[in-house]
């Protein structure tokens, strides 16, 4: 019998619902919130209110596009955390209410696990390349920077992670410092394509093992811009493309140095990336370049699966469902999950 999973994602500022049937994507609907751009970052209260407005039409649209009825659903997978508590509460509450209404089981999903398993989303019109276990996943976003050894769909080992800030936060800070707008990652990436990545140098951390640190390089950028602007008030406007290109290269170098080290240490040559920063064109190109040099088999998620989306929650939920896992109706969202 076919297994149809409805996935619901509401961890931050994107309301999303998706339907997967036996691992194949039938629909993936996303409602983004533009209201946060004016504030230069996500405002939790505004995000929660927008989720309340969007959740019903988004889920209804996902079911309609999938060509199914609510009664056809086998289980409902939802993001329990980590994320903004108010946002998570909307998705969790809706999932529980729908589960009671149609008498279907609930499956809770770790948001980060969804990113890690994004390459397992199958599509009818796609090649559907999938990594073999074990593989390494470079998980990079606004809130996380980790190197994860993935032994199976449900078994993970965090080899390294940031000890302070996430790489996505560094991109946002760069954009904010230069007055470029929000979200910073795509803006910096776009300008970096027009600049010289070797024009300026930024100090890199010396952290043992496979852990990351991005607080120092943010400070390095701050002092660099401040000192140069003191000499020439037009410096940033004249050099914004080169600054973005150089800063982006420095961040990618930091990410890749530890990933290469982890791959050598483990002997694993199946390499994936996940999370919002995995959409960065410079990082994607560098992963593939290193893969060719080092004999890696690399897997890059489609751009639509790099940002927060319910398709990845549905596929992760499918694996949990097949493992016999169910969530109780009194389950509560958690803003921080210490481990998978």
What is the role of each PLM region?
Residues 1-2, 109-135, 316:
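Conserved phosphate-binding catalytic cores of ATP/NTP-utilizing and phosphoryl-transfer enzymes
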Residues 2-82, 111, 115, 243:
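N-terminal beta-alpha supersecondary unit
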Residues 15-20, 137-139, 145-149:
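Short beta-strand scaffold segments in enzyme catalytic cores
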Residues 69, 190-271, 280-294, 321-324, ...:
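A contiguous, well-structured pocket-lining segment that forms one wall/lid of small-molecule binding clefts
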Residues 69-80, 266-278, 299-302:
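Short glycine-rich phosphate-binding loop at a beta-alpha junction
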Residues 108-109, 288-313:
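Conserved phosphate-binding/catalytic loops in two-lobed NTP-binding clefts
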Residues 113, 151-194, 218-219, 223-227:
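Glycine-rich phosphate-binding loop plus the immediately following alpha-helix
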Residues 115-117, 301-339:
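Glycine-rich phosphate-binding/hydrolytic loop that grips phosphoryl groups
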């Amino acid at each position: 019998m076919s297994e149809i999973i409805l996935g619901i994602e509401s961890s931050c500022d994107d309301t999303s619902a998706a339907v997967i049937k036996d691992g194949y994507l039938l629909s993936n609907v996303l409602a983004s919130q533009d209201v946060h751009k004016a504030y230069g970052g996500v405002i939790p209260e505004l995000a929660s209110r927008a989720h309340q407005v969007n959740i019903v039409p988004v889920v209804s649209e996902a079911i309609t596009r999938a060509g199914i009825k609510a009664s056809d659903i086998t289980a409902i997978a939802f993001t329990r955390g980590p994320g903004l508590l108010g946002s998570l509460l909307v998705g969790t509450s809706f999932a529980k209410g729908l589960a009671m209404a149609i008498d279907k089981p609930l499956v809770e999903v770790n948001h980060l696990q969804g990113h890690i398993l994004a390459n397992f989303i199958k599509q009818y019109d796609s090649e559907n390349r999938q990594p073999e276990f074990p593989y390494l996943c470079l998980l990079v976003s606004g809130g996380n920077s980790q190197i994860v050894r993935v032994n199976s769909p449900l078994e993970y080992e965090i080899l390294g992670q940031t000890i302070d800030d996430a790489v996505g936060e560094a991109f946002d800070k760069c954009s904010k410092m230069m007055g470029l707008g929000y979200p910073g990652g795509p803006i910096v990436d776009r300008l970096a394509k027009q600049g010289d990545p070797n024009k300026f140098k930024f100090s890199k951390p010396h952290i043992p093992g496979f852990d990351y640190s991005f607080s120092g390089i943010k400070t390095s950028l701050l002092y660099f811009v401040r000192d140069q602007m003191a000499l020439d008030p037009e410096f940033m406007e004249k050099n914004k493309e080169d600054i973005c290109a150089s800063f982006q290269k420095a961040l990618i170098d930091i990410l890749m140095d530890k990933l290469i080290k982890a791959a050598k240490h483990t002997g694993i040559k199946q390499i994936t990336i996940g999370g919002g920063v995995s959409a960065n064109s410079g990082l994607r190109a560098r992963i593939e370049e290193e893969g060719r040099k080092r004999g890696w088999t690399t897997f890059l998620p489609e751009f639509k699966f790099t940002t927060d989306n319910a398709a990845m929650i549905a596929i992760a939920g499918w694996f949990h469902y097949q493992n016999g896992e169910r969530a109780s109706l009194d389950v509560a969202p958690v803003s921080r999950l210490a481990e998978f």
